[in-house]
A protein has these predicted regions:
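Extended hydrophobic/aromatic-rich secondary-structure runs
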Residues: 1-2, 103
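Sec-dependent signal peptide recognition
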Residues: 2-8
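N-terminal signal peptide c-region/cleavage motif recognized by signal peptidases
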Residues: 14-16
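N-terminal, motif-rich segments that launch catalysis or mediate targeting to/interaction with membranes
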Residues: 18-128, 135-217
Length: 217
């Protein structure tokens, strides 16, 4: 029951979010934590104790990219302009977000996995749930997932498509409407999905992001 409630709350919260700097990742994971029942909280707490909260734990995957360079490619899947579909078979040898998501889920579910590996797996899963719903994380290698697609946003400031989706949209919405507006917009849609396992939908989420990337970039 812990797994079903945890994965449902995490994945459904991330489905309606669209920007993933620290604010987005932390908001989704903290709100997912609030939906857990007492037994699920008891199971999760030891795995996030090092960070003090699940929201903070979900930022860890970005913090370690400089030190653990092999994990950088785990955050996205880039396909050429001619390729419309995303699936795990297209991942390069060094991995992509779809394959890495499944790998970390399997580690987390494996009863024989060491505690330290379960910790990291949970932190990765929490982070990837956000990244996989960011369209530029399913973009094109030619423009580095939107990093070379330049534009202007808010008072004519220079930016790029990846930064826009990754955090500037949510920062702008939070400034204009407030954080409570963002949370209410997402959490109001969740209850009907609780109790359903959504962990098998990873590839469809990546495909949705790919479809948006192809329309918007």
């Amino acid at each position: 029951m812990f797994k079903k409630i945890f994965f449902t709350s995490l994945f459904i919260l991330s489905m309606d979010s669209s920007a993933w700097w620290d604010t987005g990742h932390q908001m989704v994971c903290d709100e997912a934590y609030k939906l857990l029942n007492p037994s699920a909280v008891k199971a999760l707490d030891p795995l996030i104790e090092e960070h003090g909260s699940f929201g903070r734990a979900c930022l860890w995957a970005d913090w370690i990219k400089g030190e653990r360079k092999d994990t950088r490619s785990w955050h996205y899947i880039n396909l050429s302009d001619s390729e419309k579909d995303t699936y795990a078979a297209k991942c390069p040898e060094n991995g992509c977000i779809i394959a890495s998501f499944y790998e970390q889920l399997n580690i987390l579910k494996d009863k024989n996995t060491s505690f330290s590996k379960k910790e990291e797996a949970l932190w990765f899963v929490g982070h990837f749930a956000g990244d996989i719903h960011q369209p530029m994380h399913a973009g094109y290698p030619e423009d580095l997932g939107g990093n070379r697609h330049f534009l202007k946003f808010e008072n004519g400031k220079n930016t790029n498509m990846h930064k826009l989706w990754d955090g500037q949209i949510i920062d702008h919405m939070e400034f204009v409407h407030g954080k409570d507006y963002l949370l209410d917009n997402v959490t109001s849609k969740i209850k009907i999905f609780l109790g359903i396992d959504h962990s098998h939908e990873i590839e469809s989420w990546a495909q949705e992001s790919r479809d948006i990337a192809m329309q918007k970039s």
